[in-house]
Regions:
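Extracellular glycan-recognition regions
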Residues: 1-191
Length: 191
C-alpha cells in the first residue's frame, strides 16, 4: 500500500517494502503552526497518499519516543494550514497518545500515557469534514482518541508521519497500512 504514497520532507534514511515502511528521522523534523509560543515548523516527515473523498486509514506504528516532541503516527493534510496528526508522542517525560489539529493555529491534545509501550495501531476516518481518530493497543479494540472537524476539500493526503524536533535518529516502523471507504460505525462502537 505504501506504493501510492509520496513524501513531504523526505528523510535522509528510509526504506519502503511492500508491507512495511522504515524511517530514521532527521534532526529538527516537526510539524507545528503558530503555536502558543509562535513556533512554526514544517519539516516533519510525511508519506501521504492522495484521496478525493471520505476514507478510513489505518496503520500500525512502532517507535521509541524518548525526547520531548518525538512523535510517530498518522497525518491527514489539506495544506500547511489545515491538518491533523495523531499517534505516539513524548510529552511530560513519558510516551503518550497525542493529537495535534491545525486550522491556521496548532493545538495539542494529550491522551493516555503509554508507559513502556512502543507500538500501537491508529485509525482515522474522515466523512464530510468530520475526523474520527481512534487508537488501539491490540488492533482489535478501538477507543476514540479525538473527534474533530477539518474543512471539506477536493483533495486530502493521508499517511504515516513522524518527527524528532530536538534530535535525529529515531527509528520508526509503519506496517499494516490500509486505505478504504469510510467505516460507518457509531461513536460507541469500539470495533
Amino acid at each position: 500500500m505504501f506504493d501510492i504514497c509520496h513524501w513531504i520532507n523526505e528523510p535522509e534514511t528510509w526504506l519502503a517494502e511492500p508491507e512495511r515502511l522504515r524511517v530514521i528521522t532527521d534532526r529538527h523534523s516537526d510539524f507545528w503552526n503558530q503555536t502558543h509560543d509562535g513556533a512554526e515548523r514544517h519539516s516533519g516527515h510525511f508519506f501521504g497518499a492522495r484521496v478525493t473523498s471520505g476514507f478510513t486509514a489505518q496503520v500500525r506504528v512502532a517507535a521509541r519516543c524518548k525526547n520531548q516532541g518525538d512523535h510517530a503516527g498518522l497525518m491527514v493534510r489539506i495544506d500547511e494550514q489545515h491538518w491533523l496528526r495523531a499517534g505516539i508522542g513524548y510529552f511530560d517525560d513519558t510516551p503518550q497518545l497525542l493529537s495535534v489539529l491545525t486550522l491556521g493555529r496548532s493545538d495539542l491534545a494529550v491522551g493516555a500515557p503509554l508507559g513502556e509501550r512502543e507500538e500501537l495501531w491508529l485509525r482515522v476516518t474522515l466523512t464530510q469534514g468530520t475526523l474520527r481518530v481512534q487508537a488501539s493497543l491490540d488492533g482489535q479494540r478501538w477507543p476514540l482518541l479525538r473527534l474533530a472537524s477539518l474543512p471539506v476539500a477536493g483533495e486530502y493526503r493521508v499517511g504515516p508521519v513522524c518527527g524528532t524536533p530536538e534530535r535525529g535518529g529515531m527509528e520508526v516502523a509503519f506496517s499494516e497500512f490500509s486505505l478504504q471507504a469510510p467505516l460507518q460505525r457509531g461513536l460507541a462502537d469500539l470495533s
